Amino acid sequence: MPGTGATGASVSTTPAAPEAGGGTVPFFYGSNLYAQKFGTVDPFQLTGTSQEFTYNVIPGGFLRGVRLQFRSSGGVGGTATPDNPSNLFSSMKFENVDGSEIMKPMGGYAYLQGARFFRPWDGDPSRRYDWAAGPNPSGNIFLRPEIRHTAGVLANTDARSQYRVTYTLNTAAGTITGGTTAPTVSVTKYAEIWAQPDAADAHGNPIEPLPPGLNLATLRRHDVKTLNGAGADNVIQLSLTGNEIRGLILIVRDSNNARQDYLSDPIRWTIDNRNLGVLSPDEVFDHMFDFYENLSNGTSTRPTGVYVFPRFYQPGRLVGEAWLGTTNATYLTWESATTAAGLNLPGTVEIIADEVVPVGALPMELESI
């Protein structure tokens, strides 16, 4: 029978207290993601004049970025302009606590392509459930300094120093042509955040207080160049050098601001005396399809006039290459003649650069992602 003849020490039925000593818990396991709405929703009916709005980002944790969810109502008639709904924003920017710009003023279409091609793991915003072009445009654009897995996050724990987001709503004619009633636009803003972890977990193990990606700063800038007349040569120089580059996007437009595939064969891409490629436009597009899964599997399409040159590594798919190092003296160019069949010229080439600035030791798993 159980217990008969037992002579050993008595056994306690009280659970033992947990013991510390399991080592330091990495930030990733001690934190969590959350989002918090901030600022007011200020409905605004589009007019013949653009309107600027500025909001302080709510403090707390480590900021990944700001999502702008835009909705419209009341618009009647008309035709969406080619870059609708993203061109609802004629300008967007994200400012540091000291007023310097982390994400420089650019149009909504430029930020749409930046979200799509510099943060491809978030997917194509134009394929989301709420993306709609027309007299009542809707969708969302994520202004995201963070790359992924905390790389590039921003310390946002001091209520005395706040980040700011500013956007300018376009004119009615800039978004809709021929409409009888302009839409009223509402923009809801969310701060996307890594939470500040507790000092220790439930077992008393200390938790890393800071994310490893805090040692990396990111920057988004653009540069607009002239596209010469039909058949003329273009030497398109990037003036935004001095940091490591994660990726570059060229957006080519005619004089009517319509996007066009106007670069011709060959496109010579060079940095100082080093050749980065002598490519046809088709080869540039093939490289895009090689690198971006949503292009190769057909869930997204390449936008007309958009040429992408990624310079980062996707760990999950084992594709890509290292960040492209530059100095202030770096001479980086693309040389290509404007196609002979081009119309409505001269036009423009907008260069969008996604840059990184290491400010401390960076874990290898975050290098070149």
Model-derived features with residue positions:
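Beta-strand-centric surfaces of beta-sandwich/beta-rich domains
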Residues: 1-369
